């Protein structure tokens, strides 16, 4: 899980979702997981 100020999709499988007011990226590739914070 990478925590970044600005998150962006790395590949086409990455999906941007909002959970409890926190933006996250989930993907089939675990290396692409990101959270905005």
UniProtKB/Swiss-Prot annotation:
GO molecular function, one term: structural constituent of ribosome
Keywords: Ribonucleoprotein, Ribosomal protein
SUPFAM superfamilies cross-referenced by the UniProt entry: Ribosomal protein L36
Statement: the UniProt record of this protein carries the keyword Ribosomal protein: yes
One Gene Ontology term from the biological process aspect of the record: translation
Pfam families: Ribosomal_L36 (PF00444)
Domain of life: Bacteria
InterPro entries: Ribosomal_bL36 (IPR000473), Ribosomal_bL36_sp (IPR035977)
Cell cycle in keyword set: no
Any one annotated GO CC term: ribosome
Similarity field: Belongs to the bacterial ribosomal protein bL36 family.
Protein name according to UniProt: Large ribosomal subunit protein bL36
Organism annotation: Metamycoplasma arthritidis (strain 158L3-1) (Mycoplasma arthritidis)
Lineage: Bacteria, Bacillati, Mycoplasmatota, Mycoplasmoidales, Metamycoplasmataceae
């Amino acid at each position: 899980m990478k925590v970044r100020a600005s998150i962006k999709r790395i590949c086409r499988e990455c999906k941007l979702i909002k959970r409890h007011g926190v933006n996250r990226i989930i993907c089939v590739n675990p290396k692409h997981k990101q959270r905005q914070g």
